[in-house]
Design a protein with these regions (language model features):
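Beta-rich strand-turn-strand
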Residues: 105, 321-327
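Residue-level preference for nonpolar/small residues embedded in alpha-helices
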Residues: 30, 92, 269, 327-328
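Conserved ATP-binding N-box helix of the HATPase_c
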Residues: 335
Length: 350
């Protein structure tokens, strides 16, 4: 166990935050030993798996950071068109998707290029371009932090929702995911519904894309919209897309006929948070050159809103986590003032 470790390499925002205690887990036995020794009970504990969806609000984390770095991918079973694959929690998510696509396995290709680790994916129920983790999730193994005992969680027990799971709410901090099992297919229809995908394929003359071509297209689309975290700190999409009642949406549509939307079950409508942010703005704040009345491209010294995607908040260096928190609050207020919609963070605030 190390003391006073700077977490800058362990969070994609690139903020300096000091962990009072820090331990890297490379084997499940190490985690169980840590629990047996009572270390997780002694300290306020943060389980960190990649750090790509975390915002440290303070300069010091007065507790223990447990960084999960276990590796391994194995085939559990293969039968006809289906294959069950297990990935350890510390596996890099984009690498795992790339591996599966390279094998010709369908089910997670639209989730390509989402930064993070496999173990964090179920916590957030990551999703993109019409696909969510829960669609291919079979089960996961997790260790209870109080006892060190291993438990298997089925899809139903995980209570997946939009960027939600039982690990993010009711059981937050009580379990550490150690591996995830995926049910994938050797042949399946590709999800090509989203406009960005259609436009990219058309632009590149691809009429009937292969699994690999779809994967590569999504990687290219994400690269065109998101900053390279090695150059500019960010956590990808900072806010969730709000889901509103159809009545509220119809009222908005009368005023904003071009508002994009996606129909949801039970009479709900999902509205892109990026569009709402881009079409509201910091009218009472100093604006970046060329930003007009939109948040898109807005900058306030160390932090700002990415110029290519209003949903992404960025850290240019030299700032603090609280700078992002304050910017997020201003954006939330401006969206609610203009559209009457509350947007909430997708990023985990620590």
């Amino acid at each position: 166990m190390k003391t006073n470790v700077n977490l800058r390499p362990y969070n994609s925002f690139g903020f300096d935050a000091i962990a009072k205690y820090f331990v890297e887990i490379n084997a499940i036995d190490d985690l169980q030993a840590l629990i047996r020794n009572g270390e997780l009970q002694k300290h306020k504990t943060l389980i960190l798996s990649g750090g790509n969806n975390v915002l440290f609000q303070e300069d010091v984390f007065d507790g223990l950071v447990v960084y999960i770095n276990t590796k391994g991918v194995e085939i559990l079973s293969e039968d006809g068109n289906e294959i069950i694959v297990r990935a350890q929690a510390g596996e890099d998510w984009p690498d795992f998707v790339r591996f599966c696509v390279g094998k010709g396995w369908h089910g997670i290709e639209n989730l390509a290029h989402i930064p993070g680790k496999v173990g964090a994916a179920p916590v957030q129920n990551i999703g993109a371009y019409g696909m969510e983790l829960k669609d291919s999730f079979l089960q996961c193994k997790a260790i209870e932090t109080a006892t060190g005992e291993t438990r298997v969680f089925t899809k139903e027990e995980c209570r997946f929702g939009y960027r939600e799971s039982i690990f993010k709410r009711a059981l937050k901090g009580q379990y550490v995911i150690t591996s995830v099992d995926f049910l994938l297919q050797k042949n399946a229809p590709l999800h090509l519904e989203y406009g960005n995908i259609k436009a990219y394929l058309k632009q590149n003359g691809i009429v009937n894309p292969t699994l690999q071509q779809l994967h590569d297209a999504i990687c290219a689309i994400r690269d065109s919209k998101l900053p390279d975290v090695k150059q500019i700190g960010s956590a990808g999409s900072f806010f969730k897309n709000p889901v509103i009642d159809v009545e509220q949406f119809e009222a908005l549509q009368k005023e904003y006929p071009n508002i994009p939307h996606y129909d949801e079950p039970n009479g709900k409508v999902k509205v892109p948070a990026g569009w709402l942010i881009e079409h509201s703005g910091p009218s009472t704040l100093r604006q970046a050159q060329g930003s007009g009345t939109s948040w898109k491209g807005w900058r306030d010294e160390h932090v700002g809103v990415y110029e290519k995607q209003a949903l992404v908040l960025v850290h240019y260096g030299g700032g603090k986590g609280q700078d992002i928190v304050e910017l997020a609050h201003k954006i939330q207020d401006s969206v609610e003032a203009k559209f009457g919609i509350k947007i909430s963070p997708e990023v985990n605030l620590v």
